A protein has these predicted regions:
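Eukaryotic intrinsically disordered and solvent-exposed regulatory patches
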Residues: 3-5, 58-61
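Local sequence-structure signature of Cys/Sec-based thiol-disulfide redox active-site neighborhoods
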Residues: 7-45
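Beta-strand cores of modular interaction/reader domains in eukaryotic scaffold and signaling proteins
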Residues: 17-19, 45-50, 72-74, 79
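Thiol-based oxidoreductase modules, predominantly thioredoxin-like and allied folds used
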Residues: 40-59, 67-68
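Terminal leader/tail segments of proteins
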Residues: 52, 57, 97-119
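Short Fe-S-cluster ligation motifs
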Residues: 59-69, 110-113
Length: 119
């Protein structure tokens, strides 16, 4: 269907995509805000898709990933996870590894600061 095709094209054409409620500058839920904040703090170039703008995308992304909640982050076309998973990966250093492995530029010093503040 069209939503699935749009989602596939979006995650293929963009290195880091966050399907979220709201936008990067105006998140509409705390979970979306948390991941957007992490991506922005790490100076990552990423695309925000506001699922509130399109019910087909909102439901379509849940079907696409077989994951029931939003936000959802994709890196190089692969579903990484939602808020809890991304937060855990950030704190464990796994997110750094994921970005490094996929040649995605990010601010390593900022990532280290987040971990220091949460240790």
């Amino acid at each position: 269907d069209t939503a699935q095709a749009t989602i596939k094209e979006t995650i293929t054409d963009n290195d880091v995509v966050l399907f979220m409620k709201g936008t990067s500058s105006m998140p509409q839920c705390g979970f979306s805000s948390r991941i957007a904040g992490v991506l922005n703090f790490l100076n990552i170039s990423w695309l925000d898709i506001n699922v509130l703008d399109d019910e087909n995308i909102r439901q379509g992304i849940k079907d696409f990933s077989d994951w029931p909640t939003i936000p959802q982050m994709y890196v190089k076309g692969e579903f990484v996870g939602g808020c809890d998973i991304i937060t855990d990966m950030m704190l464990s250093g796994e997110l750094d590894t994921l970005f490094e492995t996929n040649d995605i530029k990010f601010d390593k010093a900022a990532a280290d600061k987040v971990r220091e503040a949460n240790s």
